[in-house]
């Protein structure tokens, strides 16, 4: 069932523009599959799907093969930061990054894959990312790096 559902997900996002998990769940239901948003979310993560911009304000799900077209993780991260970040701030050892709606997970994933030594981990919502930084003295340098890449 899971492999059938994941194959269907790849077929759907390959054939049409799917912007949200709910849209994807609806397409699966139209194919007779009973799914929850949580199941779709897990499938997206397991399949390594990414969100790619289709315009300044919209993005769609894409297969990981499209991510392979970006040669380096750092290049992908720079592009994501430049194209989606709207604000950077901090509190103690946490850097907070605001993105365009729907892009926080992609940016946080790219940060995680960059293996920055000062980053302990990230937590992403729809448009907000918390980055836990250690040591606290590294916060300003990390914020400066992000701001430079955003410009």
From Swiss-Prot:
It is found in: Cytoplasm. One of its GO terms (biological process) is protein complex oligomerization. Pathway: Amino-acid biosynthesis; L-arginine biosynthesis [regulation]. The keyword Amino-acid biosynthesis applies. Keywords: Amino-acid biosynthesis, Arginine biosynthesis, Cytoplasm, DNA-binding, Repressor, Transcription, Transcription regulation. One of its GO terms (molecular function) is DNA binding. Gene3D superfamilies: 3.30.1360.40, Winged helix-like DNA-binding domain superfamily/Winged helix DNA-binding domain (1.10.10.10). Signal peptide: none annotated. One of its GO terms (cellular component) is cytoplasm. It comes from the Bacteria. The keyword DNA-binding applies. Regulates arginine biosynthesis genes. Belongs to the ArgR family. This is Arginine repressor. It comes from Heliobacterium modesticaldum (strain ATCC 51547 / Ice1).
